[in-house]
Amino acid sequence: MATLSSYLLSSPPLCKSRFSATSLVSGIDFISFSPRTTLSSSSTVLPAILSLSVKHNRRRNSLQVKSVASPTETISEFDEMVSGTKRKYYMLGGKGGVGKTSCAASLAVRFANNGHPTLVVSTDPAHSLSDSFAQDLTGGMLVPVEGPEAPLFALEINPEKAREEFRSASQMNGGTGVKDFMDGMGLGMLVEQLGELKLGELLDTPPPGLDEAIAISKVIQFLESPEYNMFTRIVFDTAPTGHTLRLLSLPDFLDASIGKILKLRQKITSATSAIKSVFGKEEKGPDAADKLEKLRERMVKVRELFRDTESTEFVIVTIPTVMAVSESSRLSASLKKESVPVKRLIVNQLLPPSSSDCKFCSIKRKDQMRALDMIREDSELSALTLMEAPLVDMEIRGVPALRFLGDIIWK
């Protein structure tokens, strides 16, 4: 059986990218999408006006793909994912520590090597994407990745930036929170009296999952601009399971939140009018309710993207343990409830069969086989296409290692 170490030793030196660029700057606020060009002397950036067509120069094969739903069947699994030039989004998610980032990065490399200009984005606070590519991807900037045959860019988003945006959406004219929100209406003295509405908690504390949702919505805004329509494959390395599920419920949460503010408005409308008439005080700029409504609209757009069966697919990543499989089953059920399309399940870190007398290896593999049996018998997971990824002898870092992993998973 081939190992990563032998693959890397036999691989030719990493070739330089087949593209160059001079200007890639986005006007999106909160995240500066200007490219980083100081990584190395050979790193270059893609021009905004460059138009690329996808070239499918690979040899088409009819591949054997394992499915837990039925015996081995003949289909072209990766050909389905790589075909066409219409933009597609792939969200990879699952329990923390199962290898989501490595799988996402390997898919991005695979797409690029098959001619697709690709962007891989991490919204995971752990910032593991930098480790996977062995490049510094932090700072909210698009970074070109060298090696693939088509342009590949990577981006890590700082969730704290998203939290700051939520706080700014709930503040009046540069204020610091709910007190300024009320002061801006001339009603600061009513804050304590209206404490049962918990408005301060609402406006000053971002709800769980909002940071990732805002980050994804910003990337969508960025990709909708004409100068970036070259990307035909977008791969998201999402945060652990809980964040993803909370993200999908955010529009409903914000509906309730805005409802609280509107309820507050109704209670104090007459008092506001009286104070304005006496002191001549005028509202300046949009209020918190208006800002949060715009934010809610963006969250709805993110949820709609997750549910778009034509352009989006969520890929669950797990490992062969009882706990991980159980969480993956719950994730699959929750995604189905939210109408998110899920077709594939990656089981990562599988031990290969061994002819040695390693007792630990034998016991561990039997334990993993029991976990695979759980998947085959699970009502949620058994319908998904099973994709197996082995436990390799070296850490997956850098494009050559990601190419090795991608050739195994994404057949």
Swiss-Prot record:
It catalyses: ATP + H2O = ADP + phosphate + H(+). It is an enzyme of class 3 (hydrolase). InterPro entries: Anion-transp_ATPase-like_dom, ATPase_ArsA/GET3, P-loop_NTPase. PANTHER family: ARSENICAL PUMP-DRIVING ATPASE ARSENITE-TRANSLOCATING ATPASE, ATPASE GET3B. This is ATPase GET3B. One of its GO terms (cellular component) is chloroplast stroma. The keyword Zinc does not apply. It comes from Arabidopsis thaliana. The keyword Cytoplasm does not apply. Its EC number is 3.6.-.-.
